[in-house]
Amino acid sequence: MASNKTTLQKMGKKQNGKSKKVEEAEPEEFVVEKVLDRRVVNGKVEYFLKWKGFTDADNTWEPEENLDCPELIEDFLNSQKAGKEKDGTKRKSLSDSESDDSKSKKKRDAADKPRGFARGLDPERIIGATDSSGELMFLMKWKDSDEADLVLAKEANMKCPQIVIAFYEERLTWHSCPEDEAQ
């Protein structure tokens, strides 16, 4: 993506001197109006963007490396910092120390991140199973994701029974009795 200023200049040139066909020949250049949100997916930062001249229904998540609008990203990050500082001052009066606040923030971030089926991804296969928490859980690999999550077996049984069956079938072993072989 081109920077906000660069893209606007290019668009101006297109409108002043070149035909509409040239505009259509470069459909990959769009102008970012505003950065709305930020997330990390598979270790890569993505931004939720409002595109200039498009409706909110056309907003998209784009990887940071595809973007060249540092001013808009900086504005967004500064607004996020300002919002967190306001919240932080309220929490500081309630918490005993800075270190406690940063530890609880990390826990909140981890707790806020959707896990399992809440991520809205389709299950690909079950990698393993455990009952270390007292309940049977499956380690689920998701389609189009490198991350795996522990999900309750009860939930997997309801939401993806064929994947659960495939997991058990892979581990099924048959033992024949000597009497059966004689017949």
Curated annotation (Swiss-Prot):
N-acetylalanine modification sites are: 2
Q: What post-translational modification does the entry describe?
A: Phosphorylated by PIM1. Phosphorylated during interphase and possibly hyper-phosphorylated during mitosis.
Q: Which residues carry this modification: N6-acetyllysine?
A: 5, 10, 44, 50
Q: Which UniProt keywords apply?
A: Acetylation, Biological rhythms, Chromatin regulator, Isopeptide bond, Nucleus, Phosphoprotein, Repeat, Repressor, Transcription, Transcription regulation, Ubl conjugation
- By its UniProt entry, which Gene3D superfamilies does this protein fall under? 2.40.50.40
Q: Which InterPro entries match?
A: CBX3_chromo_domain, Chromo-like_dom_sf, Chromo/chromo_shadow_dom, Chromo_dom_subgr, Chromo_domain, Chromo_shadow_dom, Chromodomain_CS, Heterochromatin_chromo-domain
Q: Which GO terms describe its molecular function?
A: DNA-binding transcription factor binding; transcription cis-regulatory region binding
Where in this protein does the record say Phosphoserine is found?
A: 93, 95, 97, 99, 176
- UniProt lists compositionally biased (Basic and acidic residues) regions at 82-125
Cross-link Glycyl lysine isopeptide (Lys-Gly) (interchain with G-Cter in SUMO2) placement: 5, 10, 21, 103, 154
| Domain of life (superkingdom) | Eukaryota
What sequence ranges are listed for the domain Chromo?
Answer: 30-88, 121-179
As for subcellular location, the record says: Nucleus
An example of a Gene Ontology BP annotation on this entry?
A: negative regulation of DNA-templated transcription
Which function does this protein serve? Component of heterochromatin. Recognizes and binds histone H3 tails methylated at 'Lys-9', leading to epigenetic repression. Probably involved in the repression of many genes located in euchromatin, such as E2F1, MYC and CDC25A. Involved in the formation of functional kinetochore through interaction with MIS12 complex proteins.
Q: What is this protein called?
A: Chromobox protein homolog 3
Source species, please? Mus musculus
